[in-house]
Regions:
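Short, flexible/disordered intra-domain loops and linkers
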Residues: 20-29, 179-185, 233-237
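His/acidic metal-ligating clusters that form di-metal
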Residues: 37-50, 134-221, 278-301
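Extended active-site neighborhood of metal-dependent phosphoesterases/phosphodiesterases
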Residues: 62-157, 161, 190-200, 216-230, ...
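Binuclear metal-dependent phosphoesterase catalytic core
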Residues: 213-302
């Protein structure tokens, strides 16, 4: 292995069981999208690792994780996965593991420590036996990030005890995203406290928004990966094809990343309407969007 570490990031793969309907509608066929992305990547033997940052399954079902694990195991390099808000703990833990596919929390390579954070941990319920589970009867499909005291303390501990010179955080919810509908003041505050305490953290790789971009938070880069379910650009306001991100990590602490989108006529870059724009700007909620679409369907008879 050279001093440079090469990693490929997938996010928001949203695998579906055969015949199942995608949550929220407007979705690509994610199995088809994965195949297209895998073919577009081509030779990947130079990679040190593939990282998947959550929303692995669309409904958090065991069959969806089996499909995802089968897909990820096609890579000839190690794959490591962390959960997103669509991923339900028990099914995720039981279904994703395969030879070469893992859910490790910390991976140290060369000068780097890669932390894999559960950015929905603050929404979990602690049982009497100490295990954390999804609250029964509740959904976090459209929820923003929340570390909670337990996950934040774990991050602090890892940052304080690692011998690595540099730390990079992989997670589903990017901290303080630039997309208004995904911004959460409490979640941003959690990360401000952590970043102010740990100078070794060099940046973040996340997903969740389905709007690939990058920005800075307290002088650290935050890289947001494309999705396989649907992708959007805000400038111009268009749909985007499925894709992924590539990363190069230098021994000096440098991080370089690029978005890669599949060039395929199956996913044309068409304009999207004002309703989606209003959703992304935080002017309406998902529930309000569903109500508007339902009213329009009643009028048109669709």
């Amino acid at each position: 292995m050279t001093d440079t570490i090469s990693i490929l990031q997938l996010s928001d793969t949203h695998f579906l069981d055969d015949g199942a309907e995608a949550e929220g509608g407007g979705a690509y066929n994610t199995s088809e999208a994965f195949d297209a992305v895998f073919d577009y990547i081509g030779d990947h033997d130079h990679l040190d690792m593939v990282v998947v940052t959550g929303d692995v399954a669309d409904h958090g079902k065991a069959a969806e994780y089996r499909k995802a694990a089968d897909a990820f195991s096609r890579f000839r390099v190690p794959v490591n996965v962390c959960p997103g808000n669509h991923d339900f703990d028990a099914a995720f833990t039981a279904g994703i593991a395969r030879i070469g596919v893992s859910t490790s929390r910390v991976i140290e390579v060369g000068a780097w420590a890669f932390l894999f954070v559960d950015s929905s941990a603050g929404k979990m319920l602690q049982q009497e036996n100490g295990l954390h589970i999804d609250p029964p009867g509740e959904t976090r499909l459209h929820s923003n990030g929340s570390l909670g005291a337990r996950e934040a303390a774990w991050i602090d501990q890892m940052c304080e005890t690692t011998n690595a010179e540099h730390i990079f955080v992989w997670l589903h919810h990017p901290p303080q995203p630039t997309i208004p509908m995904c911004h959460d003041d409490a979640y941003a505050a959690e990360w401000h406290d952590i970043l102010n305490a740990h100078a070794k953290i060099r940046g973040f790789g996340g997903g969740h928004t389905h709007i690939p971009n990058d920005y800075e938070l307290l002088d650290r880069p935050v890289f947001v990966s494309p999705s396989l379910k649907n992708n959007f650009s805000m400038e111009p306001q268009t749909w985007l094809p499925p894709g992924y991100r590539t990363y190069e990590f230098g021994a000096d602490g440098s991080v370089n990343s690029e978005v890669q989108l599949v060039d395929d006529e199956r996913w044309p870059r068409l304009p999207f309407g004002s309703l989606l724009a209003s959703l992304f700007r935080g002017e309406i909620t998902f529930a309000e969007l569903d109500e508007i679409i339902a009213r329009r369907s009643d009028v048109t008879g669709d």
